[in-house]
A protein has these predicted regions:
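Bacterial N-terminal signal peptides
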Residues: 8-17
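Extracellular or exported targeting regions of proteins
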Residues: 24-205
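Sec/Tat signal peptide C-region and signal peptidase I cleavage site
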Residues: 19-23
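Bacterial N-terminal signal peptides that target proteins for export
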Residues: 1-8
Length: 205
C-alpha cells in the first residue's frame, strides 16, 4: 500500500544517522477518560494547555480547518507520573469541507518517552483514549526510529462531505521527563504530496 511506503520513507528520512535506524515497536494500550487522568493527578482531573498546527491540505473549502492538536499537562505529586509531563495528540478534520487525500498518521520527533501504567496492570509507552473523549479512529501501531516515532492510524482519516464530528482520531498520548517545545511534525497522506508539515509540541530534547 502507498500509505505504508510513505510511513517507511518518512521514518527513514527523519531518523537516519550513518545507517538506517531500526524500528522499535512501542506498546500501545487503549484506555478511557477520565480514568487515564489518574496516572497524572490524584483526583483524576488534569489542567491542560492546548495548541493546534494547521495541516495545509490544498483543496479544502476553507483554510485552517484541518489540524493537529497538541495537548500538554503536568504530573502531580503522589501519582505514577509525578514530576513528569504528559503529551496528547489528535488529528482532526471535524471542521473541514471540500476534498482531501486520506491521512494515515503522524511522524513526530518526540525524543525519549516513559513507560507508565496507563491501564490497570498494563505498563505501556502510548495510550489511546477510545472512550470518554473525542474521536473515532485509533492507532494501528507506534514505532520508534531513533528519536522519531511513527504513529499509524487504525484506518485512514478521510474527508467525507462537509464538517463532521466523527472525522477525527482519538486522543493518543505519551509521557516524558521534560517540558514542551515547538517542532515541525509530519502528517502522512495517501496522495501527493505524501507529507504535510505541521506544528506540534514535543518534549524538549
Amino acid at each position: 500500500m502507498r500509505i505504508l511506503k510513505v510511513v517507511a520513507g518518512a521514518a527513514a528520512a527523519l531518523a537516519l544517522g550513518a545507517l538506517a535506524a531500526r524500528a522499535q515497536p512501542l506498546t500501545v494500550v487503549e484506555v478511557n477518560a477520565p480514568a487515564v487522568n489518574c496516572v497524572f493527578h490524584p483526583a483524576c482531573t488534569i489542567t491542560v494547555s492546548d495548541s493546534v498546527g494547521f495541516i495545509p491540505l490544498p483543496y479544502l473549502a476553507a483554510p485552517n480547518t484541518a489540524f493537529l492538536q497538541s495537548r500538554t499537562f503536568s504530573g502531580a505529586a503522589g501519582t505514577p507520573a509525578a514530576g513528569k509531563a504528559g503529551y496528547m495528540y489528535r488529528i482532526s478534520l471535524t471542521q473541514a469541507a471540500g476534498s482531501a487525500d486520506c491521512l494515515g498518521g503522524l511522524v513526530l520527533n518526540f525524543g525519549p518517552a516513559l513507560k507508565l501504567p496507563y491501564a490497570p496492570n498494563k505498563v505501556a509507552d502510548v495510550f489511546v483514549i477510545t472512550s470518554g473523549g473525542l474521536g473515532s479512529i485509533g492507532l494501528k501501531s507506534a514505532e520508534r526510529f531513533g528519536e522519531v516515532i511513527v504513529f499509524e492510524l487504525a484506518r485512514p482519516l478521510c474527508l467525507d462531505g462537509g464538517p463532521n464530528l466523527a472525522n477525527t482520531t482519538f486522543f493518543f498520548g505519551l509521557a516524558a521527563d521534560t517540558p514542551s517545545m515547538t517542532t515541525a511534525a509530519q502528517i502522512f497522506s495517501s496522495g501527493n504530496p505524501p507529507l504535510y508539515s505541521v506544528d506540534a509540541r514535543v518534549p524538549s530534547h
